[in-house]
Amino acid sequence: MPELTMGSLFDGIGGFPLAAIRNGITPVWASEIEPFPIEVTMTHFPDMAHVGDITKLKGAELPPVDIICGGSPCQDCSVASGTRAGLQGARSGLFFEQIRITKELRDADILRGRSGQSVRPRYFCWENVMGVFSSGTPHGEDFRIVLESIARLHCPTVSIPRPYPWGWKPAGAIRMGDAFSLAWRGFFAEYWTLAQRRHRILLVADLGGSSAEKILFDYCGLSGDLASGEGTWQAVAESVRHCFTDTSWLDWLAGRQRENGAV
């Protein structure tokens, strides 16, 4: 199998490149604007190119990669934010730059003659705070927009409904046949060797296949994973595994609510 490659947006001090290297993936380039984090990643990943400010990048001019990762600024979505401007905010709204870059990369690959599962990037990863489940108007609208924006990289006309009236759950998935899949779940720092109650969302999309839920929910031994957290991970994986469908997001959501005693 050819070696996978990755591009990292909002790179910070290189968390995604570090994870990539530990899993046999090559980080090819990164986008970051702060000088100190760039110095850190230049030291740790000397072969990784730095491509600059995401708002000034053109995806068609970037080296193609198999995986695109990013943790867009979370301040406007965080419950600690004073205004909670969400995706309408100047910082958290940079999420749409990740969508733009991904689309431009894929469009350029299609022009090169690629199609189907060979179009790059095939995999899309996004990390953010759990506050995105509740930010936006109406309540939780921002996460619906996130899901819809990513799904439209595959199908430009698709619409993702709101999970009215219950709100978003910390784990879930969407699949469009065998040609697109998306999964998200909450990660809790106390199970990953960090003595903090720091909760984050990790979202993975397979833009050309059905592997997103397998990537995100199948348990495997990862660096820093404590045995005490294994049961929690496996419980989440088991609770969502049977919920994936090819046709009905609303059926999946209703099923989850019934399991939780909400309906």
Model-derived features: positions:
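Conserved SAM-binding strand-loop segment of SAM-dependent methyltransferases
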Residues: 47-53
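A short, Lys/Arg-enriched amphipathic alpha-helix followed by its capping loop at the start of a domain
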Residues: 15, 19-26, 44
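Short alpha-helix immediately C-terminal to the canonical SAM-binding loop
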Residues: 36-39
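Class I SAM-dependent methyltransferase "Motif I" SAM/SAH-binding loop
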Residues: 8-14
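Class I S-adenosyl-L-methionine
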Residues: 57-65, 77-263
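Short SAM/SAH-binding signature in class I
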Residues: 65-71
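Extreme N-terminal starter segment of soluble prokaryotic enzymes
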Residues: 2-6
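Conserved acidic E/D residue at the C-terminus of a beta-strand in Rossmann-like folds
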Residues: 31-34, 127-128
